[in-house]
Regions:
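Terminal amphipathic alpha-helical/low-complexity segments used for targeting or macromolecular assembly
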Residues: 1-44, 48-49, 66
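Structural signal for interior beta-strand "rungs" in well-ordered beta-sheet cores
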Residues: 37-208
Length: 208
């Protein structure tokens, strides 16, 4: 799923799940590419009333109005779509590259993310790590890991040692130490998972 500023859960679902409609997917990708080219810039941008303190590297990032960046380690090649009504907070020790963060998001406390889309009012904190993943509105992620997941609205994974791989979720509550995987070790990746809306995984559960 290509990420861009206006990506919605509905559009991402169509692109991810309707690959048997190649003409539709090709046209959607063309529209996304056209929008992306219109937004493309050789320079980063810092909007009005932005607060940046004790921060390491910021390179090729578009920062929206009223964003707060405090103690962040590294931000590279991304967009932070903050605004006055819903400012974005990027806190201590965050490392992010190839990302888009939507309005009202809160990312702090050592989060590491790469090639991710973070939706409106999402909270990622407490050493959570993610790559190649989509998080849509009001997701909350702490402590665990995510790899190539489609986290629909209100997906929650707050416990330590939780691992979500190659799955699609919404209104999920992942238990402590739960593992949703797409491979059996030596066999390598074999499929992707779809967990029904509103599911709850128990502690130390394993779903293949």
């Amino acid at each position: 799923v290509p990420i861009y500023n206006r990506l919605s859960a509905q559009l991402a679902y169509i692109i991810a799940m309707y690959r048997h409609r190649p003409d539709l997917i090709a046209r959607l990708r063309e529209m996304i590419e056209a929008y992306s080219l219109a937004q493309k810039s050789c320079y980063g941008k810092i909007g009005n009333s932005v607060h940046i303190v004790n921060t390491g590297t910021i390179r090729n990032v578009c920062i929206g109005d009223y964003c707060q960046i405090d103690g962040t380690s590294r931000l590279e090649n991304g967009s932070i779509n903050s605004n006055r009504e819903a400012p974005v907070y990027i806190g201590p020790n965050v490392t992010a590259e190839d990302f888009i963060v939507s309005s009202g998001a809160h990312i702090s406390d050592g989060v590491v993310m790469s090639r991710c889309f973070i939706g409106q009012a999402c909270h990622l904190t407490h050493l959570f790590s993610a790559h190649d993943s989509l998080f849509f509105s009001n997701c909350q992620s702490e402590n665990g890991e995510a790899c190539a997941i489609f986290a629909g609205p209100y997906t929650v994974t707050m416990h330590k040692s939780s691992l979500l791989i190659a799955g699609m979720f919404s209104f999920l509550n992942a238990g402590s130490g739960s593992n949703q995987s797409n491979h059996m070790y030596k066999l390598g990746p074999i499929h992707q998972g779809v967990v029904e809306r509103g599911s709850k995984t128990t502690s130390d559960s394993y779903i293949l």
